[in-house]
A protein has these predicted regions:
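Active-site phosphate-binding strand-loop segment of PLP-dependent enzymes
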Residues: 144, 149-220
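Conserved core segment of the aminotransferase class I/II
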Residues: 225-304, 314-316, 399
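Conserved glycine-rich beta-strand-loop-beta hairpin in the small C-terminal domain of fold type I
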Residues: 287, 303-317, 325-339, 373
Length: 404
């Protein structure tokens, strides 16, 4: 029989959030072992439910959602997103500049496929949400990682960004609020990055899926709102803020000047048409979700589940000898650092695999987020405090075997 292998286009594509360690976790679950899965930010798995009005909308619109929609999405959803962008002070956004997708993930891949030729470069943060690096590679481009500095609240290193720009650089990706670090970028930093994009004719891709999940009185500033003269592609959605990750509701907004990117927009339209449309029934909940009461706010205030769980896991990490972390300002994740002077750890993937096998908890290693050293891992702080306390005990016990 003729042997078939995976496409060579996938040679440099990796997505370790659902990689080999997950495969081992699935094998263990199939054998009846109970695994606490902290590899993805999936609110429903931890008892978070969608707002009642969202479910009501879904039921009421089921019959009206049996056919295809416009490839960019239904009018009511795009209109609601346009109004949301106006409130956020996005410049020069019309309804035709908005694309609905089956989650942001689909749109990230589409945005890279429409832009890149072989050898083109995209600046991507390190650490990153690994789909960005994978999508660049799949499209034939090269992801060039710029450093985010843990000692400076995980903010992007401006000098490092400048040093990575070449004649092949087409764009820069900003993940703000950041996954996996929970960092939230101040306006002054965003303006510096916008100036770099302006001077080098770069497209800005802004992954802002956690913009409604900010804590401690901080405010998220959309990069597009500060860049009226720079073409920006902003990504957002409802998976996290409205606890409906399984519905797959994401959107992409084009803002700023567009005359010089007409060819790129033609490519986006072509790719959008090829997939016909995103899930029409899920699109029906966008208008209700973005208008009126935002129930996620209650989860992010003192006493709210996410707020209290974030505080607990941050303090718990500080109490484990040899671990440290920057306190997240937003999102669902914390990215602890392991002191390798205290612990013998040279392979972070093996470290989280061993933790899975011994303690039945699934984490993601730092290099799964394209971090350069084997000294970090990501924790999802969606479990309730009593479960997070168990993780603290398990990690404290587990680390003892690595002590120098």
């Amino acid at each position: 029989m003729k042997e078939y292998n995976k496409s060579s286009k996938l040679e440099h594509v990796a997505y370790d959030i659902r990689g080999p360690v997950l495969e081992e976790a699935m094998r263990m679950r199939a054998n009846g072992e109970k695994i606490l899965r902290l590899n993805t930010g999936n609110p429903a798995e931890f008892g978070f439910t969608a707002p009642d009005e969202v479910i009501h909308d879904l039921i009421m619109n089921a019959r009206d959602s049996e056919g295809y929609s416009d490839s960019k999405g239904i009018f009511s959803a795009r209109k609601a997103i346009m109004q949301y962008c106006q409130l956020k002070k996005f410049p020069n956004v019309d309804i035709d500049d908005i694309y609905l997708g089956n989650g942001v993930s689909e749109l990230i891949v589409m945005s890279m496929q429409g832009l890149l030729d072989n050898g083109d470069e995209v600046l991507v943060p390190m650490p990153d949400y690994p789909l960005w690096t994978a999508a660049v590679s799949l499209a034939g481009g090269n992801a060039v990682h710029y450093v985010c500095d843990e000692a400076a609240e995980w903010y992007p290193d401006i000098d490092d960004i400048k040093s990575k720009i070449t004649s092949n650089t087409k764009a820069i990706v900003l993940i703000n609020p950041n996954n996996p670090t929970g960092a939230l970028y101040p306006k002054e930093l965003l303006l510096e990055i916008i100036e770099i994009a302006r001077q080098n004719d770069l497209i800005i891709f802004a992954d802002e899926i956690y913009d409604r999940m900010v804590m401690d009185g901080h405010v998220h500033t959309p990069v597009a709102s500060l860049a009226p003269d720079v073409f920006c592609v902003s990504m957002n959605g409802l998976s996290k803020s409205h606890r409906i990750a399984g519905f797959r509701v994401g959107w992409m907004v084009l803002s700023g000047p567009k005359t010089h990117v007409k060819g790129y927009i033609e490519g986006l339209n072509m790719l959008s048409n090829m997939r016909l449309c995103s899930n029409v029934l899920a699109q029906q909940v966008v208008q209700t979700s973005l208008g009126g009461h935002q129930s996620v706010d209650e989860l992010l205030l003192p006493g709210g589940r996410i707020y209290e769980q974030r505080n607990f896991i941050y303090n718990a990490i500080q109490d484990i000898p040899g671990l440290s972390a920057v306190k997240p300002k937003a999102g669902l994740y914390i990215f602890p650092k392991i002191d390798r002077n205290m612990y013998r750890i040279d392979d972070d993937e093996q470290f989280v695999l061993n933790f899975l096998k011994q303690e039945k908890v699934l984490l993601v290693h730092g290099r799964g987020f394209n971090w350069q050293e084997p000294d970090h891992f990501r924790i999802v702080y969606l479990p309730r405090v009593d479960e997070l306390a168990q993780i603290q005990d398990k990690m404290t016990r587990f680390l003892k075997q690595y002590r120098r």
